[in-house]
Every structure is written in structure tokens, then in C-alpha cells.
UniProtKB/Swiss-Prot annotation:
Compartments in which it is found: Endoplasmic reticulum membrane
Stated name of the protein: Dol-P-Man:Man(7)GlcNAc(2)-PP-Dol alpha-1,6-mannosyltransferase
Organism field: Saccharomyces cerevisiae (strain ATCC 204508 / S288c)
Gene Ontology cellular-component terms listed: endoplasmic reticulum; endoplasmic reticulum membrane
Record lineage: Eukaryota, Fungi, Dikarya, Ascomycota, Saccharomycotina
Molecular function GO terms recorded: alpha-1,6-mannosyltransferase activity; dolichyl-P-Man:Man(7)GlcNAc(2)-PP-dolichol alpha-1,6-mannosyltransferase
Keyword Transit peptide set for record: no
Parts of the chain on the Cytoplasmic side: 24-61, 111-136, 200-202, 249-275, 325-331, 387-417
Bilayer-spanning residue ranges: 3-23, 62-82, 90-110, 137-157, 179-199, 203-223, 228-248, 276-296, 304-324, 332-352, 366-386, 418-438
Pfam family name, one: Glyco_transf_22
Broad class of the protein's primary localization: endoplasmic reticulum
């Protein structure tokens, strides 16, 4: 695999997003807890696995978790040699998510190399065939692809997240798309079909699109398209049934079970439905701000060779098919986003390398490209700044652990209610039981919770006052509030309005204040401090003992 400085920048940006937002949310919980259990208990003793206590509505595949756990194992081995004492395993969580980010990042780089190899091969052939004629050059196509990626908040932020769409699914679909660009159509159909049945069934729409348009463009026969699709589905089914039936202790094929429950039975619609056009009118616009890449797609498609057209049409087919599912989420079509960027990169490379700079309009047109990337990057950083404040459960757990360590508290039980568990609490964040003896209870059943309530020494909950806690005599206070955790809840426009609409000021004087009087750094700090609203959402309580009450 060829490597460039920009490849390193891509991985660095992905890592930066990870460090800025180290916690996870409920959508990521299955994979992160499964990876924790595999690393902690091994695959041979599943009796203590979290999914047996909290199985969820339908089974989910363990295949991705097993792969990521295997790739993370060397870190555990090295850390055991160093023998450093760590209060929690949050560092392991960061490594695990870093491995997920690495698989996604390397797949983007591989796809970039496939794009560039395709254009380099085409250019060489044209040079041999037309020695005396000018030909279009696309030497920067791969570079533009990476630049568009780096400015994409959704791909950079979520590349390290243990959402099922990003744990092996997106990396392998990127490889499949790369194989199409290299002319390996049968292999691409085989791999994408395997990914669909093992990891995410919606990828079957992308796989079908690759097969359909490979046949339409006469790259393979219909027989081969069907044959390799069946081979992929067959091998993937065998892998999933073998692995997942073991972990779930019953025969299952999770992606089929999920399809029957969510799509056939219609339970996914309970999470909300949107119009057929929503992916095109809302989600794609949300993922491409400003919409330069989308605008370049029309131009890029006209210039694209057949291989790239197959990739782009297959991705469009994927989005269209998913549009008929009433419940929509941006991550369901994330596998099509790299293809959109491939076309955008093709259009950008053509303009950048082949447009003659003779008119002012041409200069302005070319200037839009780097300006657009800079704008996307700044928008992405703004989204990151806000998004990192949306994991208060993880912050609350960290503050609780710090208190336990600082005050040398041992052998206690803390109950964590559902909302904190959904916004950052994971098994990796728990203190080492052998050292501190802290039990982290997450019981959801009301009857069991009432029975266990007297045994809790601490609570991390969403209830703002002790009088609102369940199973308590409202006239007697048994709990002391020891900590609160804030979360981003909105914007206050007062500061920016007062700054912009000062008396007797114009644009130049405002810029002077920002650049010279305050400096941009100070202005941004003041802007964020005065405009971003954070409110208390989680509350940590300590049980008041009888002797403390008397005192």
C-alpha cells in the first residue's frame, strides 16, 4: 500500500476525534461491551458476558467484536509486561476504538489508492495511444478524496465508534468498492454479500447494485453475478451461524433475525418514519456542508470511467432501495458516502489540473475547491466541539471514580440509572474490583430494583432532587447530593447579537476588535463560554448513614 503525508494526516484527524470524545453511547454499547467481555473473560467462558444479562430485543453479531478484540489483544499483552496499575480500563477502551478507527482509516486509504491506480492506468494507456495529443490528467484525484474525507464530520467522528456500521462493515465495503475500481467485480460481489449477511443486511442493496451494474456495463455475466453473490451469502451465513450461535447459546443468524423483527414486523418504524425522499433532501445535505462535493458529482460522473460509474450507480441504487424503508438513519447509507466523494474527487481533480486559468471566473471556480474544504473542516470542528459534550454518563462515571479513589472508598455499591448508561457508561470505565471492591449495578427491573435499593451506597441518576428518587419516603432524606454532571442543551444568541449590533460599528471595526483588540483565540473562547448552554442532567448521591444524620 502506497503511503503519503496526507494518509498520516487522515489517521491523525481520526485519532483527534477519538481523544476529544472518548466515551460511547447506547447505539455502540453492544459491541463495546462484547469486546470488553472477550478481552476480560476470553471466548471460552461466556457465563459472565454482559449480553446474557441484557440480551436486547434481537441477537446481534459477535463476529466484528471478536475481530476487534483479537486486534486489540497485543496491547493487553504489552501492558501486562509493563505491569502498571490502572484504576480503570478506559485506556483499553480507547485502544479498542482506536483499532476500529484504524480499520476504517486504512480502508479509506486503500480506496484512495485504488482510485489513483485506476486513473494512472487509464492515463498511461491514453499516452501510449495518443502520443501527440493533450490528455486529461487526474494525478490529484486521490488527494482530493482524502481532503474531502478529512473535512467530513460524520466519517471522522464515527470512524472510531463501535456502531455496527463501522465495526468491520464500512472497512470491508470500502475494500469491495476498491476492488470494483480495480476490475475485480466477482470478488467485490462476493465480499459485499458476505458483509451483508454477517454484519449489516442493508449492505445487500449495495452488493446487488454492484452486481446489477457490473452486468449492465458488460463486465461480468449474470450467471457470475448471481454465483458469487450466493457464494458470499453462503460463506457469510456459515460464519455467522457458527460464531453467533455459540455466543447466544441458541441457533441464530442475527442479521436475518433483525430484518424479520425491524423490517418485516415493522418495529423499526416505532423509532420514527420519514418521507421516501429524506435521504436526498435531508441526510445527504447534512453530511455534505457546504454541498460542493454533491455539486461536483454531476461533473464527476460525466468524466468517470466505467469502473467508477459502476461504483457510483451501485451506491445510488443502495440509497434508493433504503429510501423505501420508512425508518431512516444517516448511518444506513454511510457505505455510499465514500463513492460520492470518489466522484467529487474526480470532478475536483479535473478542474484543478486541466482547467486553463485565463479568466477570472476560472480562478474563482478553482478557489472554491480549497475554500470549500477549509469550510467543511471548520464546520466539522464546530460539530466536534458540541458533540464531545453529549456523553454526560461517561463524565458522571469518571467523576464518581475519581471521588472513590481520592477518598479511598472501598467495598461499596453504586446504582446507575438507564440515562447515564445510555450516554457513556461502559464496563471499561469501572474501577478494578480487586483493588476497590466497587459494584456497579444497572438493574432495570423495577421489582428487583426495589428489593436491592437498601444495599446501594451511591446513585448516579437523572433525578435532580433526592425527593424524586424511587422507593423513598418523601419526608425523609436518605441521600446527599455529592456531584452534578452537565450536558450541552442549546445556544444562547445574546452575546453574538450584542457584539454584532453594537452602536456605531461596521464590518471592518468588528474585524478589528476580533483580530487586534481581542485576538481570534480570546474571541472564540468568549463566544463559546457565553453562547453554549450546558445544564445539569445527571446527579450523584451518597447514602446518608444514621450516625451522619445524628451528627
Amino acid at each position: 500500500m502506497r503511503w503519503s503525508v496526507l494518509d498520516t494526516v487522515l489517521l491523525t484527524v481520526i485519532s483527534f476525534h477519538l481523544i476529544q470524545a472518548p466515551f460511547t453511547k447506547v447505539e455502540e454499547s453492544f459491541n463495546i461491551q462484547a469486546i470488553h467481555d472477550i478481552l476480560t473473560y476470553s471466548v471460552f467462558d461466556i457465563s459472565q458476558y454482559d449480553h446474557l444479562k441484557f440480551p436486547g430485543v434481537v441477537p446481534r453479531t459477535f463476529v466484528g467484536a471478536v475481530i476487534i478484540a483479537m486486534l486489540s489483544r497485543p496491547y493487553l499483552y504489552l501492558s501486562s509486561l509493563i505491569q502498571t496499575s490502572r484504576p480503570t480500563s478506559i485506556d483499553v477502551q480507547l485502544v479498542v476504538r482506536g483499532i476500529v478507527g484504524l480499520t476504517n482509516g486504512l480502508s479509506f486509504i486503500y480506496l484512495k489508492n485504488c482510485l489513483q491506480d485506476m486513473f494512472d492506468e487509464i492515463t498511461e494507456k491514453k499516452k501510449e495511444e495518443n502520443e501527440d495529443k493533450d490528455i486529461y490528467i487526474y494525478d490529484s484525484a486521490g488527494t482530493w478524496f482524502l481532503l474531502f474525507l478529512i473535512g467530513s464530520f460524520h466519517l471522522m467522528f464515527y470512524s472510531t465508534r463501535t456502531l455496527p456500521n463501522f465495526v468491520m462493515t464500512l472497512p470491508l465495503t470500502n475494500v469491495a468498492l476498491g476492488w470494483v475500481l480495480l476490475g475485480r467485480y466477482n470478488a467485490a460481489i462476493f465480499l459485499s454479500a458476505l458483509v451483508a449477511i454477517v454484519f449489516r443486511l442493508e449492505v445487500s442493496a449495495l452488493s446487488a447494485g454492484i452486481a446489477l451494474f457490473s452486468v449492465i456495463f458488460k463486465k461480468i455475466s449474470l450467471f457470475d453475478a448471481i454465483k458469487f453473490g450466493i457464494f458470499g451469502l453462503g460463506l457469510g451465513s456459515a460464519i455467522s451461524i457458527t460464531v453467533d450461535s455459540y455466543f447466544w447459546q441458541e441457533w441464530c443468524l442475527p442479521e436475518v433475525d433483525g430484518f424479520l423483527f425491524n423490517v418485516v414486523a415493522g418495529y423499526a418504524s416505532k423509532w420514527g418514519v420519514e418521507p421516501v425522499t429524506a435521504y436526498f433532501t435531508h441526510y445527504l445535505r447534512m453530511m455534505f456542508m457546504p454541498p460542493t462535493v454533491l455539486l461536483l458529482n454531476y461533473f464527476g460522473y460525466k468524466l468517470a470511467p466505467a469502473k467508477l460509474k459502476i461504483v457510483s450507480l451501485a451506491s445510488l441504487f443502495h440509497i434508493i432501495v433504503l429510501s423505501f424503508q420508512p425508518h431512516k438513519e444517516w448511518r444506513f447509507i454511510i457505505y455510499a458516502v465514500p463513492s460520492i466523494m470518489l466522484l467529487g474527487a474526480t470532478g475536483a481533480a479535473h478542474l484543478w489540473e486541466n482547467m486553463k486559468v485565463k479568466k477570472i471566473t476560472n480562478v474563482l471556480c478553482l478557489a472554491i475547491l480549497p475554500l470549500s474544504i477549509m469550510t467543511s473542516f471548520f464546520i466539522s470542528m464546530a460539530f466536534l466541539y458540541i458533540s464531545r459534550m453529549n456523553y454526560p454518563g461517561g463524565e458522571a462515571l469518571t467523576s464518581f471514580n475519581d471521588m472513590i479513589v481520592e477518598k479511598n472508598i472501598t467495598n461499596a455499591t453504586v446504582h446507575i440509572s438507564i440515562p447515564p448508561c445510555m450516554t457513556g457508561v461502559t464496563l471499561f470505565g469501572e474501577l478494578n474490583y480487586g483493588v476497590y471492591g466497587i459494584n456497579y449495578d444497572k438493574t432495570e427491573n423495577t421489582t428487583l430494583l426495589q428489593e436491592m435499593w437498601p444495599s446501594f451506597d451511591f446513585l448516579i441518576t437523572h433525578e435532580p432532587t433526592a425527593s424524586q428518587l424511587p422507593f423513598e419516603n418523601k419526608t425523609t432524606n436518605h441521600w446527599e447530593l455529592v456531584n452534578t454532571t452537565k450536558m450541552f442543551t442549546g445556544f444562547d444568541p445574546t452575546y453574538i447579537k450584542n457584539f454584532v449590533f453594537q452602536e456605531r460599528v461596521n464590518v471592518l471595526s468588528l474585524l478589528k476588535q476580533i483580530i487586534f483588540d481581542k485576538t481570534p483565540t480570546v474571541f472564540l473562547k468568549e463566544l463559546t463560554a457565553n453562547s453554549i448552554v450546558k445544564s445539569d442532567v445527571f446527579f450523584t448521591y451518597k447514602r446518608i448513614k444514621q450516625d451522619e444524620k445524628t451528627d
